[in-house]
Amino acid sequence: MYNVGKIVNTHGLIGEIRVIATTDFPEERFQVGNTVYLFEKNSKKPEKLIIRSHRKHKNFDLLMFEGFTGIHQVERMKEGVLKIKEAQLTDLEENEFYFHEIIGCIVVTTDGEELGEITEILTPGANDVWVVKGSDKKEKLIPYIADVVKEININDKKITIEVMEGLLD
C-alpha cells in the first residue's frame, strides 16, 4: 500500500479531518467515492473508508468519510495515515514518476560524484524539490527541472544531475 496522507487533526464539529497530503495527486486521490485505508497510530490493521467530501482549506485537504458524522467519531483518527492499494495507482505519462519511485534513489553528478539518497520530495510551487541526504548527513536541495536533472533510471534507483553554479553551496 502507498501513503497518500497523514491526518493531523479534526476540523469543526461535523466529522471533517485535516490531512497533509503525501500524494502527487490529492484532487484525484481524495475524490468523492474513492476508497482509502486508515492505519491508526500504532495499528497495523487498516480500516476501509469511503470519501464523502473533499475540499481544500489553507495548506490542508479536508475530508469526510461515509458513516462518520461528528467530531467524536473521527478524533481517534488523529495521527493516522491514509493509504491506497497499488491497483489504485494510475498510469503516468512518459517521464513522470510517483514519489515512491523517486524516494530512495541515489543522486550522482554528471562527473560521477555520489551526492546521496533522496529522502523526501517538497512541493513548494513551480517545481518539486528533492531532499538529498549525503553520507555527511547534510541535506542538499535539488530542484526537479530539466536544466539540473539529466537522467532518471528507476530500475537502478539512480538519478544523474548536472550541478549548476551555486546549486550545492
UniProtKB/Swiss-Prot annotation:
GO molecular function: ribosome binding
InterPro entries recorded: PRC-brl_dom, PRC_barrel-like_sf, RimM, RimM_N, RimM_N_sf, Transl_B-barrel_sf
Gene3D superfamilies: PRC-barrel domain (2.30.30.240), RimM (2.40.30.60)
Keywords of this entry: Chaperone, Cytoplasm, Ribosome biogenesis, rRNA processing
Domain (PRC barrel) ranges: 94-167
Compartments where located: Cytoplasm
Primary subcellular site in the record, as a coarse category: cytoplasm
Gene Ontology process terms (BP): ribosomal small subunit biogenesis; rRNA processing
GO cellular component assignments: cytoplasm; ribosome
Complexes and interactors: Binds ribosomal protein uS19.
HAMAP family, per the entry: Ribosome_mat_RimM
PANTHER family per UniProt: RIBOSOME MATURATION FACTOR RIMM (PTHR33692:SF1)
Function of the protein: An accessory protein needed during the final step in the assembly of 30S ribosomal subunit, possibly for assembly of the head region. Essential for efficient processing of 16S rRNA. May be needed both before and after RbfA during the maturation of 16S rRNA. It has affinity for free ribosomal 30S subunits but not for 70S ribosomes.
Family indicated by similarity: Belongs to the RimM family.
Domain notes: The PRC barrel domain binds ribosomal protein uS19.
Name of the protein: Ribosome maturation factor RimM
Organism: Listeria monocytogenes serotype 4b (strain F2365)
Encoding gene (name): rimM
